[in-house]
């Protein structure tokens, strides 16, 4: 599920200094200012370690500050992920199941968190290396399940991102029809619980 959240690419020279990494991270943060809200179509291609295509798909992605996320895979099998800034909902229509998680616990495990987070604490968990129009984001935690996320821009517009996991699978997402979130689109970030579904609530409970 981490990979889906990334929904959902490396090779950084060892001679790069910490200052260079910091500058690259700041450049990415500056670029993301222009992506404060985004709605886009995506096409997904997943290849294994042998570069064999093992999955394709398409759908809609939306992002908005602060901490709002919408992912709707429409083909080949429907699934949906919605984050309202507090909770994250994962809906599998085929299984008729909804999983609810704490937003911070779920999204912070993924470098995609940087697309919806602006706080220094979150950014300090990743190293960023700029390569032409792309930025490679690597988690500092060795057990994250993700090796690298690469996000690419053209004229400051997010055009694609790739996710490489620790099993060698590469998920490539090509974006099109990018738009700024409208007032009507804000409803995307409010999950409406379907009827007659099983609910797996994994949110952390406050202990009395």
UniProtKB/Swiss-Prot annotation:
Residues 1-22 form the signal peptide. One of its GO terms (cellular component) is outer membrane-bounded periplasmic space. One of its GO terms (biological process) is lipoprotein localization to outer membrane. InterPro entries: LolA/LolB/LppX (IPR029046), OM_lipoprot_carrier_LolA-like (IPR004564), OM_lipoprot_carrier_LolA_Pbac (IPR018323). HAMAP family: LolA (MF_00240). Belongs to the LolA family. Participates in the translocation of lipoproteins from the inner membrane to the outer membrane. Only forms a complex with a lipoprotein if the residue after the N-terminal Cys is not an aspartate (The Asp acts as a targeting signal to indicate that the lipoprotein should stay in the inner membrane). PANTHER family: OUTER-MEMBRANE LIPOPROTEIN CARRIER PROTEIN. This is Outer-membrane lipoprotein carrier protein. It comes from Shewanella sp. (strain W3-18-1). The gene is lolA.
């Amino acid at each position: 599920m981490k990979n889906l959240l990334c929904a959902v690419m490396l090779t950084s020279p060892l001679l790069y200094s910490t200052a260079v990494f910091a500058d690259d991270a700041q450049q990415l943060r500056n670029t993301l200012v222009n992506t404060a809200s985004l709605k886009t179509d995506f096409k997904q291609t997943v290849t294994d370690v042998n570069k064999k295509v093992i999955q394709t798909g398409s759908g809609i992605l939306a992002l908005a500050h602060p901490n709002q996320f919408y992912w709707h895979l429409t083909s080949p099998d429907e699934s949906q992920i919605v984050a309202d800034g507090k909770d994250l909902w994962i809906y599998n229509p085929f299984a008729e199941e909804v999983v609810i998680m704490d937003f911070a616990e779920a999204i912070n495990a993924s470098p995609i968190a940087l697309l919806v987070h602006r706080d220094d604490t979150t950014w300090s968990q990743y190293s960023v290396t700029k390569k032409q129009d792309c930025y490679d984001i690597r988690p500092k935690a060795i057990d994250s399940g993700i090796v690298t996320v690469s996000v690419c821009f053209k004229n400051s517009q997010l055009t694609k991102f790739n996710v490489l996991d620790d099993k060698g699978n590469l998920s490539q997402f090509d974006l099109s029809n990018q738009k700024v979130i409208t007032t009507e689109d804000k409803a995307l970030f409010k999950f409406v619980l379907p009827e007659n579904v099983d609910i797996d609530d994994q949110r952390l409970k406050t202990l009395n």
